[in-house]
Amino acid sequence: MAESVPIPEPPGYPLIGNLGEFTSNPLSDLNRLADTYGPIFRLRLGAKAPIFVSSNSLINEVCDEKRFKKTLKSVLSQVREGVHDGLFTAFEDEPNWGKAHRILVPAFGPLSIRGMFPEMHDIATQLCMKFARHGPRTPIDTSDNFTRLALDTLALCAMDFRFYSYYKEELHPFIEAMGDFLTESGNRNRRPPFAPNFLYRAANEKFYGDIALMKSVADEVVAARKASPSDRKDLLAAMLNGVDPQTGEKLSDENITNQLITFLIAGHETTSGTLSFAMYQLLKNPEAYSKVQKEVDEVVGRGPVLVEHLTKLPYISAVLRETLRLNSPITAFGLEAIDDTFLGGKYLVKKGEIVTALLSRGHVDPVVYGNDADKFIPERMLDDEFARLNKEYPNCWKPFGNGKRACIGRPFAWQESLLAMVVLFQNFNFTMTDPNYALEIKQTLTIKPDHFYINATLRHGMTPTELEHVLAGNGATSSSTHNIKAAANLDAKAGSGKPMAIFYGSNSGTCEALANRLASDAPSHGFSATTVGPLDQAKQNLPEDRPVVIVTASYEGQPPSNAAHFIKWMEDLDGNDMEKVSYAVFACGHHDWVETFHRIPKLVDSTLEKRGGTRLVPMGSADAATSDMFSDFEAWEDIVLWPGLKEKYKISDEESGGQKGLLVEVSTPRKTSLRQDVEEALVVAEKTLTKSGPAKKHIEIQLPSAMTYKAGDYLAILPLNPKSTVARVFRRFSLAWDSFLKIQSEGPTTLPTNVAISAFDVFSAYVELSQPATKRNILALAEATEDKDTIQELERLAGDAYQAEISPKRVSVLDLLEKFPAVALPISSYLAMLPPMRVRQYSISSSPFADPSKLTLTYSLLDAPSLSGQGRHVGVATNFLSHLTAGDKLHVSVRASSEAFHLPSDAEKTPIICVAAGTGLAPLRGFIQERAAMLAAGRTLAPALLFFGCRNPEIDDLYAEEFERWEKMGAVDVRRAYSRATDKSEGCKYVQDRVYHDRADVFKVWDQGAKVFICGSREIGKAVEDVCVRLAIEKAQQNGRDVTEEMARAWFERSRNERFATDVFD
């Protein structure tokens, strides 16, 4: 007998064992445990001690039906309370399992499934018509709508029963009962065995009430069929009339009820989840999205979808397979050992012990899928490659379960999913309602995206009525109306001027704010912004009957998240596709990204012209490194854009109305107002990390229950303006502290309108008070006074003095109002000048491996004398954070960092080199904390070097004790550079000096395949890049090769995001 090795397991507590490992996100918890403890681990859950396997090699072993069989000892024992001996929850030796299996398998044969196509198409068209009639501005809850699709399709095709889900606002009560039943099944499975039953009296009553409701619906379906018999050959007919060829028996009425509930649950939950995840993945991956739409257009065209088309869609099939690999709605399945056996040749599993195959990790095994296993790449699932993977790595793709207990309805679900994908992408363009949406998971026994909303815009300029004819097979609408009608599809409420469309590409909100500013300015120049929206909304829908203005930025050379689909579509254009489009482009960027500065706006500008578009005015641009974005934009508006548009479209001075600003009423009733674009979190703890000098602080935050993150991600904070700054506004405009404002606006605004809202709320939460004044702002101040000296000085500041005295010193409108008391600016005009409050992103400085429900931030407090000479310059977000204490609440959202800025998936093989200074240490602390958790769980890791720069070990050596502890564990080797104590850091003053000093060690781990992470200010990023280039030259010389600096820098750029990942900030 082989020698047994203990199965790794986390430390537990008496009685409850490892129950404390679980939060409200059990899937995330299990993934974390697998990442921490490796491919096999055990949990102690009261009297249970299940084993979990997460690598392909071990999952392949437990899929051997000679050694393991399906278990009902897990959560399925609770599900069985509701469906008893239905196919999914029956024991294999129960007579009804074999009987039902033999009777029902023929009902899912190829010809039967093919015959269900017309009814599947019926329900799919109902979904399309709902999307079309709600219009492009209505957010669509994907999980809700695909749940309706899957439930109605299954009920109609399998049982000839209609739930009419698309004709009701609320979902059928069966859905809520089913969801609650499955959730409570999971909860019951995790109950401590010693907990008395009376604690769960209400939950138990609800549980059995839900079961009763589901049974009543199933009985209703059966009764309807019995009342109106038919010769349909569907699933229900097979249940009612089928005879088991082996026993000669029929299914009992009770078993039919159990089977119906089983199919209604399993048949729609998984399909709706798959389609929702597929939509998410495609919207996150524009290239794959484009290929799906191209395949639909080439195979199906504009006509009706036929069943014959579904076998000619290899790429969409690959998309569904890849979706099921990364986001399988069934995340795991349980088995039990038939006899004593060894896994991996060394881990003893005793007869009857439960082993759970964790697909959420097995499906991303880098041994099978490579180091990009976490990425959505449908090409790896095309037929030939899919077959190769499954041959070389058996059981590497198991979303439909295992062996004879695998999903019986797989052919049904596959045809339904293919059809839904085709009709949707044939007729609509989709965008995320929130382009920064980070995937949230809703988990019962299956998973699906939570709070995932999309917008659907009809393609080809169709109206809903025309779509209805197309879906009915009555012919496609003419494409000649494409862009003119598209403009109508996108129209907002139009004003009285010449219509124009404005689109933006924006991650941080700056370009969106500029676009809204442009829309507000339009009426005063004779135009009306009928459309203001993200660039993705303009995909295949660029208007031809009005000027189009595009405001966009680049992010490391890539398009903003809400412009990626537009850019991919635009790059695929041919010939003179844009010959009827008249456009103008404004570019935002930062010149420190030399290689990619303004890349995306330049690409838009040149490509539209190349494809026949008419450039209305020269492209405008702003460089955040040297000037103020808002000032540059307003200058382009006033000097270039509006004069050019007015000349092109013959707008007279009479048609140019006055500025449509804000109308503000002041009142004093007390009322609260909330902001809802982020979620509420709770401060757990905070502390100051430095002993003197510039303060660096640490804050620990309890996340909302559905929010998850990875080490290296960002936390977006919606701050409040400092009370001292808000007080200055109140003094300047003589507002009482309990004043309320009622704001009315004829143009787009992010301010709350038509309701009375606290003035304090408005100025603290909705607007930026410290944004530098623009030239237009300053000239508006000059118009609001009759004092000649004030006018003269303000006009000087708006002229040549602006670049020296306003922009670099960040002089705000409020600063100028205080400096020039003779300016009588109305509060409405002041509010109209202010940009909307934006979120600030901070690198998370912890790992979920430490505690998935909490995270930490590490930041520098900005509070210094103002460069303008008026008071102090107080950082909005850092001041906000610094005043929070335990128990305070704040609004946050997790934002994923670039894919490159995460730990390697093969931590055992790939070393890391981390370089940071000051609070740039934040994400790297998260990395090392994660490595420490892995080591504590018994994992073996590749080396890690951390180079860290600060001032003095006695003052600002951040987290020194933690890193000392982690060094002793072997999680990291720390090399420091003290700028004011070089005698304690090998004579090295700055972090780049220490990297060069220790170059022999750097070369050693680099040759082992190390990945380099750099985090800090732009100056640090540039200095470390320089030393890396220097090291590359020296390394080449050691190997006998001559490499110039230019060649070395080119190599560094090629390696960026592959072996070098940077995260720099201002």
From Swiss-Prot:
Extract the InterPro entries matched here.
Bifunctional_P450_P450_red, CysJ-like_FAD-binding, Cyt_P450, Cyt_P450_CS, Cyt_P450_E_grp-I, Cyt_P450_sf, FAD-bd_FR_type, Flavodoxin/NO_synth
Keywords annotated in UniProt: Electron transport, FAD, Flavoprotein, FMN, Heme, Iron, Membrane, Metal-binding, Monooxygenase, Multifunctional enzyme, NADP, Oxidoreductase, Transport
Effect of pH on activity: Optimum pH is 6.5.
Q: Region (Cytochrome P450) spans which residues?
A: 1-480
Q: Can you state which reaction this protein catalyses?
A: an organic molecule + reduced [NADPH--hemoprotein reductase] + O2 = an alcohol + oxidized [NADPH--hemoprotein reductase] + H2O + H(+); 2 oxidized [cytochrome P450] + NADPH = 2 reduced [cytochrome P450] + NADP(+) + H(+)
Q: Where is the FAD-binding FR-type domain?
A: 676-904
Q: Which residues form the Flavodoxin-like domain?
A: 500-641
> What is the recorded membrane topology of this protein?
Peripheral membrane protein
Please list the residues that bind heme.
C407
Would you tell me the protein name for this molecule? Bifunctional cytochrome P450/NADPH--P450 reductase
What does the record give as the organism's lineage? Answer: Eukaryota, Fungi, Dikarya, Ascomycota, Pezizomycotina
Which gene is transcribed and translated to give this protein?
A: CYP505
